[in-house]
From Swiss-Prot:
It comes from Influenza A virus (strain A/Xianfeng/3/1989 H1N2). Homotrimer of disulfide-linked HA1-HA2. Belongs to the influenza viruses hemagglutinin family. Disulfide bonds join C59-C292, C72-C84, C107-C153, C296-C320. This is Hemagglutinin.
Amino acid sequence: MKAKLLVLFCAFTATDADTICIGYHANNSTDTVDTVLEKNVTVTHSVNLLEDSHNGKLCRLKGIAPLQLGNCSIAGWILGNPECESLFSQKSWSYIAETPNSENGTCYPGYFADYEELREQLSSVSSFERFEIFPKESSWPNHTVTKGVTASCSHKGKSSFYRNLLWLTEKNGLYPNLSKSYVNNKEKEVLVLWGVHHPSNIGDQRAIYRTENAYVSVVSSHYNRRFIPEIAKRPKVRGQEGRINYYWTLLEPRDTIIFEANGNLIAPWYAFALSRGFGSGIITSNASMDECDAKCQTPQGAINSSLPFQNVHPVTIGECPKYVRSTKLRMVTGLRNIPSIQSR
């Protein structure tokens, strides 16, 4: 297909010479753009492509509210820190909002294995079913399930413990070997969490578990680990010289997970059947929740814009303009605003 260029010629009769105007009309535009070769080129017309504003709030996405963790971290929420109990009622969300310096995480000090990977897994979850994987009253008849509390996880001034875990202790002077299994019949991935207690001294080990040589074994089709408690005095954290290390795995549908131990097991109480949703995510933000609805959420605030690009924040959730680092991005819809004049 041949392209044709139409050029307008304006001829004027003059005494000394003829003047011919070639091209287009200049205007009063002050639009400037940067090109590959030049900066601040004035053009006749241009349109803005870059959104640089937000409302500074956390909003619903397409009518669905986020899960706002408040003073709780992802760890505190998923383990069941007693101070995060109010969050358990929310079963679905558009995204998860966590504050940068949340106070309520692992109330009993210790190491949370593969924590960043767990956050990554939860970032794609939009709802879950929280259910008793091992019911408290019937699963552990030979062990005590009520004495495993600690001042470091206190609630309303009383010693307490995580709402999704059970600290099993000796019963009538004995801690029999235990073996407990669960078959995933949920037709969804199930998130299972547990812990291993590492006392600070051998006296505590004997008093709580009635053995000096304890082990914890956890086995499924995709997970196989054996843990040996490390008894050692450590610097006090939240008043504790002992530690609990926290672990998790995803159990596929129809797979089986088996727990065996002769001491030191922090057993699963509740687990989570996960439903993944397109467009979910986790943001870290100090922004407050507001009665607003948006298509795009950033940690700085929500964006409601039809422009194709934004420079508010690289982390986004929802239907968002593409992030660019530019401070100005315009598309030229006219020509250079300098007419060409030729005399003859």
